[in-house]
Structure formats: structure tokens, C-alpha cells
């Protein structure tokens, strides 16, 4: 394999061979639909796939097979479509894109934009349940607040005043803190990180200069830094990748979980009917799939 060192001149042909070897090894892990059907451990899913095939209904597995062979440049992460001068791809003949970006920078930009998309998608789910908690506390949403224990313990960790205060007022302040961490524009303390992350981890993140401002800000900054002629240092791009990761974790995951448990109560273990057998013949079966699921009144749906 080519020894790819940042900042050193290298044989373009050796580099191309290196990543093409990696792509070819990666391709070997791609299952065909027949592999999925034969190896899947769930008999109900196997039966469903076979039945769908009989009915002529295509699935993700059919469409995956139809896409083969996938683009070599896309699989290697060295295709750039960010500006209108492209798309560009890295080859031995063209080791840099039109803007001058090399393979390292193109891969870093693509990774960063994927991380920013994930932070935005989970962040919007988090926003829904944070707003639901806030509006339930303010009486704008007709939903009971069931997670008193979670609210009390989290408020203590966040330094929110509780003495002689009603639960709804504490819950509102907690929701405001979570929403502020999600959407802050002026750099300040990311309170969810301060309250929920281990001290030694926070010190490492501060040393690395990757503590986020807010989830919203880091998504903005990710698209800004990865634009054409903005930041040409792949290491700086990957530093922003880590900031997006922390914002994703502490707003999109931790913040969303706090708001969900505060509104609906901490979950208990239950026995449920699952899989295809949970569907009732002769009924309209409604399938809810969101993480988290926010139940809200029709009056406020458009506002969310």
C-alpha cells in the first residue's frame, strides 16, 4: 500500500492504486438480495421479502442490486460536487479538483457535510420534543408532564433554581436551557456538556478547541468551512467535524433524551407484540416511527 503522508510528494499512481484496492475490498462486503434472504435470522422478514417478490414489489435490497456497480469515486469519497465548476474527482491525471482541493480535502469536506446533515436531522427531532416540553409547561400544549423525577434531577445538575417553585416552571426553564444549547448564536457555555460530560473529557475537548457553540451554529459553520475557497486545510475541516459530533451528541441525543424523559417519564421495560405478527388482520394498522415521538395538539402542529 502507498504510504500517504500529509504534505509529502507522492506517486499519484500509487495513491490511486491504494484507494482502489480499498474500494475493491469494500465492495466484497456488499450483500446481494439473495444473500440477505438466505442469511437473515428473522423468518418473518424472510417470508415477507419472498412474498413481496411474488407480488412484484421492489425493496431496498432490489434497488441496491440495481445500483451495482456503485461509482468508484463516490465509494472512495473523492468525488466533489460542492461548487458549479465540478463535479470533480481525483485521478492520477487530475490529482486536484478545479478549486485546488486534493483527495484529503475532498474526503474531509464530504465527511463534514455528512456530519452536519446528521446533526441537523437529529437536532430537528430534538427541537420538537424540547418545544413540546416548554409549551406543556406554559400551558400552550395540552400534554401532561410525567417526568418529575427526571426534571428535578436534571435541573439540579444544570443549576436551575427549584426551591418553592412549581414543577411546570422548573420544566420550562429546563426546556429553555436545552433550546439555547441547540440554537445559541453568541459563544457561551454549552450547559448540557458542562452538566453531562465527564470533567476529563471536557478538558480534552477544550484543549483541542472543539467545544461547540450550539448545534445550529456548528451546522452553519460546517457548510461555511467546507465551501469552495473557504478553508483549504483538511485538519481544520476535521476539527469542525468533531465539533459537529459533540453538538449532535449533546443536543440531538442527550438533550432530546432529557426532554423526552421529562415530558413522558422515564421508560419502563414492557412486553410488546413486535414484527409482522403485530399487524391485526381486518384493521387499519397505524405505524408510528419517529425518534422522538412528540404528541401535540392540532393547534400547535404548524407552529412546530
Please give the residue ranges for each predicted region:
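Metallocofactor- and cofactor-centric catalytic cores in central/energy metabolism, strongly enriched
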Residues: 11-302
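N-terminal low-complexity segments that are often proline-rich with Ser/Thr-Pro
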Residues: 2-8, 300, 304
Amino acid at each position: 500500500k502507498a504510504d500517504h503522508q500529509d504534505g509529502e510528494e507522492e506517486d499519484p499512481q500509487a495513491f490511486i492504486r491504494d484507494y482502489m484496492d480499498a474500494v475493491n475490498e469494500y465492495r466484497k462486503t456488499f450483500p446481494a438480495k439473495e444473500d440477505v434472504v438466505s442469511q437473515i435470522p428473522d423468518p418473518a422478514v424472510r417470508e415477507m421479502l419472498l412474498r413481496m417478490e411474488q407480488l412484484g414489489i421492489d425493496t431496498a435490497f432490489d434497488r441496491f442490486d440495481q445500483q451495482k456497480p456503485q461509482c468508484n469515486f463516490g465509494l472512495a469519497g473523492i468525488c466533489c460536487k460542492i461548487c458549479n465548476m465540478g463535479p470533480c474527482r481525483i485521478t492520477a491525471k487530475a490529482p486536484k479538483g478545479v478549486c485546488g482541493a486534493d483527495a484529503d480535502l475532498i474526503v474531509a469536506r464530504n465527511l463534514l457535510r455528512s456530519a452536519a446533515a446528521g446533526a441537523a436531522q437529529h437536532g430537528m427531532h430534538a427541537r420538537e420534543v424540547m418545544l413540546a416540553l416548554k409549551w406543556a409547561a406554559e400551558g400552550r400544549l395540552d400534554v401532561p408532564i410525567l417526568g418529575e423525577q427526571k426534571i428535578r434531577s436534571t435541573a439540579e445538575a444544570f443549576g436551575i433554581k427549584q426551591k418553592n417553585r412549581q414543577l411546570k416552571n422548573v420544566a420550562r426553564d429546563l426546556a429553555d436551557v436545552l433550546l439555547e444549547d441547540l440554537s445559541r448564536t453568541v459563544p457561551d457555555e454549552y450547559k448540557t456538556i458542562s452538566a453531562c460530560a465527564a470533567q476529563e473529557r471536557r478538558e480534552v475537548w477544550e484543549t483541542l478547541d472543539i467545544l461547540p457553540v450550539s448545534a445550529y451554529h456548528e451546522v452553519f459553520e460546517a457548510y461555511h468551512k467546507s465551501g469552495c475557497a473557504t478553508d483549504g486545510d483538511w485538519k481544520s475541516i476535521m476539527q469542525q467535524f468533531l465539533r459537529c459530533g459533540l453538538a449532535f451528541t449533546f443536543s440531538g441525543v442527550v438533550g432530546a433524551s432529557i426532554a423526552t424523559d421529562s415530558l413522558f417519564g422515564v421508560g419502563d421495560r414492557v412486553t410488546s407484540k413486535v414484527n409482522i405478527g403485530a399487524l391485526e388482520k381486518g384493521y387499519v394498522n397505524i405505524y408510528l416511527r419517529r425518534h422522538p415521538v412528540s404528541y401535540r395538539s392540532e393547534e400547535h402542529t404548524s407552529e412546530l
